[in-house]
């Protein structure tokens, strides 16, 4: 049975007993968790807080920003800029990196985040979330640039997400497995509710936007066609489809009971490797999924091995239960 300990105690034990995290990283993760609590409050207020609807602007991706996108982005920046652990931050909602102002001490860590994933679901009261990734600045040179962020996902020192749903749940890895914390609203604290999260190697569930099927590459078409044939087809078992249109919600379900999440290449935008962003969506989720015993690829390569060339780089994603990810990836490799 999982010990009901606080996030602070969990992180202190990771630091003290296992030597997994330095003190500055522990403090950084606690600040990110506090910021997620603040975002949860804004999400829960909804129409009463005047936070629903469009902000009338676009982000660097050309996507219309919701009011909560901007609020969540500001909360994360303001919470983290002054603590002394960070050198800079990067976000889906910002064109370029945000360097910690000179009036605050600069640390050695880099924080990347999607402040509010699944924001198309905000106005209809469906689960959304925050995704974050932590890297360590590799160079000893003064200052920080975009180049410092361009590290493969395997270099992450921590990653997590917070899902704002019926419960507010924080999922975290520091490279020593995956733990889930539930927000106790009466106490205002994060409480460990699941440790040693494991994703089953086999599954009968897949998550993908089937309305785009005609635009996918043949290997992805083949994989889905076989799933849809069920027990009468080559797979010999029936599958169920799930799709929330929020990566956080779909991946959280996979962590809880297995499944495979796919956001494949689309021939309507052939020059783009995929839809999801590598640095602050695919990498942190890939790290979490691998730490829980799953797998994450772009169809041909392990996501965490990809070397980014730009901050907002996009990528195809197949992640979740190991055997299904391997099958879908094998079809891509066979196709060349």
Swiss-Prot record:
Any one cellular-component term (Gene Ontology): cytosol
Enzymatic reactions: beta-D-fructose 1,6-bisphosphate + H2O = beta-D-fructose 6-phosphate + phosphate
Pfam families: FBPase (PF00316), FBPase_C (PF18913)
E.C. number: 3.1.3.11
Binding site for Mg(2+) 2: 114, 117, 281
GO MF term list: fructose 1,6-bisphosphate 1-phosphatase activity; magnesium ion binding
Residues the entry annotates as binding substrate: 117-120, 209, 275
Keywords associated with the record: Calvin cycle, Carbohydrate metabolism, Cytoplasm, Hydrolase, Magnesium, Metal-binding
Pathway, per record: Carbohydrate biosynthesis; Calvin cycle
Binding site for Mg(2+) 1: 92, 114, 116
Family: Belongs to the FBPase class 1 family.
Name of protein: Fructose-1,6-bisphosphatase class 1 2
Species in which this protein is naturally found: Methylibium petroleiphilum (strain ATCC BAA-1232 / LMG 22953 / PM1)
């Amino acid at each position: 049975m999982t010990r009901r300990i606080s996030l602070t105690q969990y992180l202190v034990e990771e630091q003290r007993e296992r030597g997994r995290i330095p003190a500055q990283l522990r403090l950084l993760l606690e600040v990110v968790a506090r910021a997620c609590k603040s975002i949860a409050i804004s999400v829960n207020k909804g129409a009463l807080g005047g936070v629903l609807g469009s902000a009338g602007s676009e982000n660097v991706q050309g996507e219309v920003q919701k009011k909560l996108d901007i609020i969540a982005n500001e909360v994360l920046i303001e919470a983290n800029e002054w603590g002394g652990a960070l050198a800079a931050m990067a976000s889906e909602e910002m064109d370029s990196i945000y360097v910690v102002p000179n009036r605050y001490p600069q640390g050695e860590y880099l924080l990347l985040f999607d402040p509010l994933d699944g924001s198309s679901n905000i106005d209809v009261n469906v689960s959304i979330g925050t995704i974050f990734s932590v890297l360590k600045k590799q160079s000893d040179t003064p200052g920080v640039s975009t180049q410092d962020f361009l590290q493969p996902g395997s270099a992450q020192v921590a990653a997590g997400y917070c899902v704002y749903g019926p419960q507010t749940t924080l999922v975290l890895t520091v490279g020593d497995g995956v733990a889930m914390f539930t927000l106790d609203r009466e106490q205002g604290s994060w409480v460990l509710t699941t440790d040693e999260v494991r994703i089953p190697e086999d599954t009968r569930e897949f998550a993908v936007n089937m309305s785009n099927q005609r635009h996918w590459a043949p290997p992805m078409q083949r994989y889905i066609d076989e799933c849809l044939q069920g027990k009468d087809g080559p797979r010999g078992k029936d599958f169920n489809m799930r799709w929330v249109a929020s990566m956080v919600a779909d991946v959280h379900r996979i962590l809880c009971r297995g499944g495979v999440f796919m956001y494949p290449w689309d021939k309507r935008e052939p020059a783009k490797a995929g839809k999801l962003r590598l640095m602050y969506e695919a990498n942190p989720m890939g790290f979490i999924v691998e730490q829980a015993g799953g797998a994450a690829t772009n169809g041909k390569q392990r996501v965490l091995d990809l070397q980014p060339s730009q901050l907002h780089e996009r990528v195809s994603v197949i992640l979740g239960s190991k055997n299904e990810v391997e099958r879908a990836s094998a079809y891509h490799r066979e196709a060349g």
